[in-house]
Each structure stands twice: as structure tokens, then as C-alpha cells.
Regions:
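Short secondary-structure boundary/capping segments
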Residues: 53-54, 85-87, 117-120
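Alpha-helical subdomain
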Residues: 56, 78-87, 140-147
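Conserved core segment of the aminotransferase class I/II
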Residues: 96-170
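Substrate-binding/gating loop at the entrance of the active-site cleft, primarily
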Residues: 1-5
């Protein structure tokens, strides 16, 4: 990323096949204030290992003190626990705790629409000027990327989510 300082945080302990809890919390604690962190959640790619509810809460507490923008990438909602609600815990918790959150969600995999690339991005932020700047940037990126994406994939997702019978069947 041009002009952006990037870093890494420890996440997975390959010897024990689990979250590197101590390393992860240490690295998050030492992040610069007012920075951004990206989490791939539920069915974490490529490890398929996710933090526990308690670990997410601890991560939230650390990052809230540092005013970090938290970016969640969720492509596999429903795959980790089998429940859409359970798999959305981290995003909802961070929002409830007052974080600035960016949430990218894909339906391409969990709805079996691989070639359609259906998804969306949500921003949770209380600062009006920041919201307006983000929206302006997103509109620009959208026009530069694809302008007018096909609508049928989003219509399928809307139909499934709007129908209790289809949602239960899915």
C-alpha cells in the first residue's frame, strides 16, 4: 500500500493449532494509537481458527483504548458455528463497545454464488465529517472499479433474507 505504514500481528500458533493468544494481545497492545487493524473472522482464512468470545472481548478492550479503526472481513458467516447470529458476535460486540467499525461482508461463498461476487461494506462511525469523507471515497472507488455491478446476486440475497421460510431452508 503506497504511503501507508503496515504491520503484522501474531495470530496463529501452528505448533498447537490455536490462536497465539499471548502474541496477539501483545501485538494489539503495542499498535499505534489511531491506527487500523484488519480481522478476517469466522472460518479465518487460511487457518479456520477463530478467537473465542472472551478473546474477542479482550481484543475489543485493548483496541478501544487505542482508538483503532477495526476492519472486519467476513466471507464465511454461518460456516464456523452453523449460526449466522453466533458468527456475527465480534462485529456486534465491537459496535456495542463504541468502536469505529468497517465491516465487509461477502455472500459469494455462504450462498454458493461464487461467480457473482455479492457483498457489501458497512461503516459504523458517529463523526459526520468522517462518514461523508468515507462515503465520497467509496463512491469514487466503486466507479473506478466497476461502475454498475450486476444486480441479480444482491436480489437473491435479499429474497433469501426477507423470507423466513427461505432463510430457514438456507
Amino acid at each position: 500500500l503506497s504511503g501507508i505504514d503496515t504491520g503484522f500481528y501474531r495470530y496463529y500458533d501452528p505448533l498447537n493449532h490455536e490462536i497465539d493468544h499471548a502474541g496477539l494481545m501483545t501485538d494489539l497492545t503495542h499498535m499505534p494509537n489511531d491506527s487500523m487493524v484488519l480481522f478476517q473472522m469466522v472460518g479465518h482464512n487460511p487457518t479456520a481458527t477463530d478467537p473465542s468470545v472472551e478473546q474477542w472481548k479482550e481484543m475489543s478492550s485493548i483496541l478501544r483504548k487505542k482508538n483503532v479503526l477495526v476492519f472486519f472481513d467476513m466471507a464465511y458467516q454461518g460456516f464456523a458455528s452453523g449460526c449466522l447470529e453466533t458468527d456475527a458476535f465480534a462485529v456486534r460486540h465491537f459496535i456495542e463497545e463504541g468502536h469505529k467499525v468497517v465491516f465487509a461482508q461477502s455472500y459469494s461463498k455462504n450462498m454458493g454464488m461464487y461467480s457473482v461476487r455479492v457483498g457489501g461494506v458497512t461503516f459504523m462511525n458517529e463523526v459526520r465529517e468522517e462518514k461523508e469523507a468515507i462515503l465520497k471515497t467509496l463512491k469514487h472507488l466503486n466507479m473506478c472499479s466497476f461502475g454498475a455491478p450486476p444486480i441479480h446476486g444482491s436480489q437473491v440475497v435479499e429474497e433469501v433474507y426477507s423470507s423466513p421460510a427461505l432463510l430457514a431452508s438456507w
